[in-house]
Amino acid sequence: MGLFSKVIGTHSEREVKRVIPIVDKIESLEPEMEKLSDEELRGKTAEFKKRLADKETLDDILPEAYAVVREASKRTIGLRHFRVQLIGGVILHQGRITEMRTGEGKTLVSTLPAYLNALEGKGVHIVTVNDYLAKRDAEWMGQIHEFLGLTVGVILNSMDNDERREAYNCDITYATNNELGFDYLRDNMVIYKEQLVQRDLHYAIVDEVDSVLIDEARTPLIISGSSGKSTKIYEACDNLVRQLKKGTEKELSKMDIIMKEDNNETGDYVANEKEKTVNLTEQGIKKVERFFHLENLADPENLEIQHCVNLSLRAHALMHLDKDYVVKDDQVLIVDEFTGRIMPGRRYSDGLHQAIEAKEHVKVKRESKTLATITFQNFFNKYDKKCGMTGTALTEEKEFREIYGMDVVEVPTNLPVKRIDHNDSVYKTKREKLNAIVEDIVASHEKGQPVLVGTITIDASEELSQLLKKRGIPHKVLNAKFHELEAEIIADAGQIGAVTIATNMAGRGTDIKLGEGVTELGGLKIIGTERHESRRIDNQLRGRAGRQGDPGESKFYISLEDDLMRLFGSQNLMQMFNSLGMPEGEQIQHKMLNKAIERAQKKIESNNYGIRKNLLEYDQINNEQREIIYAERRKVLDGDDMRDTIISMIDELVEKYVNMVIGDDQGPSEWNLKELNEILIPMIPVKPVTGEGCGSKQELIQNLKEEALRLYDTKEAEFPEPEQIREIERVVILKVTDSRWMDHIDDMDQLRQGIGLQAFGQRDPVVEYRLQGYDMFNDMTESIREETVKMLMHVRIEQKVEREQVAEVTGTNKDDSANAPIVRKSEKISRNAPCPCGSGKKYKYCCGR
């Protein structure tokens, strides 16, 4: 801590000091609340709502409301909010992030701002990381809110739309971040207002906020449909890649480059684990060309083969079974790198999942097409107010401030932390490290001290499990393969003699309580088998011990062969230690090592922040477009009269077509009326334009607008009830907009991938994406206008026009919560195919305009 901080205190200390007077006021009301009967305490809710209606603010009633919740908690679940929990509750209401250590009762803290903000009647969402915690917290903490007369709902993956709608209409709703995000996207795909499930996004309290807003923010939420592409190409590429040999690429120094030294690639391809890239060598390119009978792999028509070969190489060289994914029930299931959990229903995008399926010889499913997508950053920024809780957020404060506009306030613990955090033990090889870990576990087990071992991969947990079996140490393994038993395994992890191996304990959400007699043995011992890429995840593992003033200890074991050191450590330092003739099993102790580990972690954290920021920069462009489309859809769903919008579309089209054919400086004798009729009449069936009575271009435009309006009025008069044509307008706008928007999302996806591959010289790819995306969006809105007008101008009264979904939803990338599939009603016509109307023109120049 610097001298300046010592004198005036840290940011957190100053902010905590500011809320102390509010907390003192809450505590002073406790005797008064204790005197109230249950009925009188419950009556406070109606009193608070009346005070809000009388123009008091939430801040005005906060002290009394928090005192009411504290008393209700004592009477319902037998828990009284500690002073530090009241501090946390005030900070959450202010829309900030509160960092509270594991075991400090964050779940109970959330009841304070949830109750207060629910009094406005606009809904409060409490966001958790999995269904188990959402259900547990809704049942447990929900007792407090229901006692006080508020309604509590929970959103679970298995629920149908009616159940979801009912839960969202409650005062307080518990749900996972994935469910909230996907429900938002699905709400913007429905075709009737009655199908909407969510209300407006008012206030979110995010538990494990760093996990939700940072770890998971590297991948956007995606709802997908089938693209119709064949899967045979993936199997062919897999057969080819199995015949290719992995090579190495010599790293060239600056002098080598100056001397034009050849990098001497070997093998058919080179994989770089650090950068997560894989490339064919010259030799490899020739083999691919021979395999597919190609003259030149680089030709544009071979782009799909290039792409699929690259995916297959990535699947074999960079994606590892039991680390990145598992195979279960003839399916490839992704493993969350941060929590070690299997993520059912989630699939890698862009064909990578299919490449892995081919590699593992399971059924290759058809590639998907993106129908709707949003990042967590943009989704959570839609809330009027948001806040978060976690045990570890300070290391990412910059990101919370820059992207979400939230600062982090560290709340002191209720009792002093007694956990001892030992220095890391570093070994030369992985084998020596594992032997040392086993000896440490055996020693602790013999004296009865419970041990929790945190591993990064499933492989590592199973390897360690085998070593413990050989030594006869009874233990339990908790990883992605067995997470059904999760809560039961964790509940026993603090008992005397318990040994538990867990893949990435981060975000498990279940406290480990110490068994009888464990305190005297030193509490729970945490052993980390290697350092994670993120310091925050390491701190979360440490935080499993020493909860609520309990004793405990933590220690990390590292080898120079660990991925972190191998890929991101200083090469010179690694070579120096490797060259030392150290006896087998001896620990390496050097202050430079600790600095190297910290530097490596900071390097990765900075890199991951860059990935998330880059994702957000691209999605910000999509978000601007998404807001426009979703706002237009909502107008239609709300039953707005779309007549004025249609008339405006007709007027714009008339102007566009006249301007396309007739220049401002042309006189009537120069007008190309034949061309004007050819493009105008198929859209708006006016009489052939002769130019009679029009002395100027503006006069011609005005006459055509008036004739088009008369035509539309005549069309409207064909329907017995005006509401019939109004509903048809809504149906057509929805159908055309959805169809074009989904194609546009896919096109934007392709554009982004293309921009990543192109070299724009000194031009920023994000700027290029924005410029080209803007042009594509304008083209899309133009095609929506043309198709809508054309359909409405040609609609007949005997036609049965109903709202329908335009694409089949096949799944999402984060879970399997998509609703029942929606069937496409008609076969999609290729833009270049002959138009089915029989005009002889291509579809895109005729009915597909």
Task: Briefly describe each language-model feature range.
Residues Y325-L333, T339-R346, Q548-G549, F556, ...:
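Extended, charged helical/alpha-beta scaffold domains that provide interaction surfaces
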Residues K254-I257, R471, R824-K828, C846:
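Intrinsically disordered, compositionally biased charged tails
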Residues G448-S461, D638-G639, G691-C694, P836:
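Short, Lys/Glu-rich amphipathic helical modules
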Residues S110, I437, A820-I822, S830:
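Active-site-adjacent structural elements in folded domains
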Residues V453, I501, W741, F777, ...:
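Hydrophobic, well-ordered secondary-structure elements that form the walls
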Residues K825-K844, G848:
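Short Cys/His-rich zinc-binding micro-motifs
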Residues M1-G581, Y630-A631, I647-S648, E652:
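Conserved P-loop NTPase motor core
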